[in-house]
């Protein structure tokens, strides 16, 4: 039997949060997931049937839009063939293990009181800028996201980027457009010290490296590496996971009367 993930969740709080934010009960959430599951069964070009947690994740980040959830789920598989240089790199490969020490990129095991996941990112000041590889950093992120999709019960996230380890050489190795895209994709707040973090998050969650009372970055890194090891069968499978475009169904057509395909499936609600 596969041991559970080290990411802590509370399903009661999880579904309470969904109800407060979207007005959906657990039963309704399960019905949405079932709609997406039944549609997924017809996608013969996919290399596998998505996990229920993966379908749930797509539903939540799509804010219960079935149409958008379909697109996200399909892209999850399609992108692996479009970017093989990213998705064929195993988290247990020596280069990734080494780079995880150069650039810390870790989820905090315990969620916040409002059941949101914190990701902590920091460059290790013990390494030189030339040791940092932006491609491997992005690969680290995809590995972490895979863990979240398959194992987590959080759908709101906070990314803490500690810039204390950044040197001039790092900036020279990062294209300005990458920084611009980051500012567009994420709502960013900048602070000169960690005091603002202690105001926003429980001190027990944050790494000891910045004065928190949680685990150290080294300990968090080792936990994530163990999680990758636990999920070895999954990451082994991802190495060759590709869509068969010759089997892709015709693109879904929206109906003038019914609207987006699948968005208005009847839900059995009490």
Regions picked out by a protein language model, each given a short descriptive name:
Residues 1-270:
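Basic, amphipathic alpha-helical/coil surface patches used to engage anionic, phosphate-bearing ligands
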């Amino acid at each position: 039997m596969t041991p559970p993930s080290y990411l802590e969740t509370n399903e009661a709080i999880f579904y309470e949060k969904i109800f407060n934010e979207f007005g959906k009960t657990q039963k309704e959430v399960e019905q949405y997931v079932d709609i997406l599951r039944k549609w997924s069964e017809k996608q013969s070009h996919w290399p596998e049937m998505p996990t229920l947690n993966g379908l749930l994740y797509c539903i939540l980040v799509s804010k219960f839009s079935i149409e958008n959830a379909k697109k996200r789920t399909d892209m999850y598989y399609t992108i692996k063939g479009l970017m093989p240089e990213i998705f064929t790199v195993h988290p247990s490969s020596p280069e990734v293990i080494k780079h995880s020490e150069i650039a810390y990129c870790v989820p905090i095991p315990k969620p916040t009181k409002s059941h949101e996941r914190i990701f902590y990112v920091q460059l290790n000041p013990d390494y030189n800028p030339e040791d940092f590889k932006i491609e491997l950093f992005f690969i680290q992120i995809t590995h972490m996201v895979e863990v979240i999709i398959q194992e987590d019960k959080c759908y709101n996230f906070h990314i803490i980027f500690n810039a204390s380890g950044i040197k001039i050489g790092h900036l020279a190795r990062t294209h300005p457009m990458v920084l611009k895209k980051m500012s567009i994709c994420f709502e960013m707040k900048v602070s000169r010290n960690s005091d603002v973090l202690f105001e926003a998050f429980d001190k027990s969650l944050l790494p000891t490296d910045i004065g928190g009372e949680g685990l150290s970055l080294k300990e968090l890194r080792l936990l994530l590496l163990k999680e990758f090891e636990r999920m070895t069968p999954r990451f082994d499978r991802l190495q060759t996971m590709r869509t068969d475009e010759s089997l892709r169904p015709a693109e879904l057509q929206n109906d003038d009367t019914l609207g987006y395909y699948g968005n208005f499936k009847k839900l059995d609600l009490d």
